[in-house]
């Protein structure tokens, strides 16, 4: 296993399979968070297509990466809960 330099840029890519057009709905719902990040320590791209949502995160350090991953996964979970309660 390759060691990660905790001080240099670190990356994560999360792919989530979603039914129907839910990936597009999710992309639109996350757009405000992507466009106006709460921290300058991470950059995020969210792409939807073919029933998948892909979240790509680049962060300045491991702590910032962890925080961004946790935030986006929480937002995805919240959106899924809301969509589930509407259906």
Stretches with model-predicted labels:
Residues 1-87:
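N-terminal intrinsically disordered, cationic/polar leader segments
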């Amino acid at each position: 296993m390759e060691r990660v330099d905790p001080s240099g840029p670190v990356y994560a890519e999360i792919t989530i399979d979603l039914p129907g057009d839910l990936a597009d709905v999710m992309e639109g719902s996350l757009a405000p968070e992507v466009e106006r990040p709460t921290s300058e320590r991470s950059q995020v791209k969210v792409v939807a297509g073919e029933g998948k949502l892909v979240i790509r995160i680049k962060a300045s350090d491991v702590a910032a990466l962890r925080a961004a991953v946790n935030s986006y996964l929480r937002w995805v979970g919240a959106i899924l809960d809301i969509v589930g309660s509407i259906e």
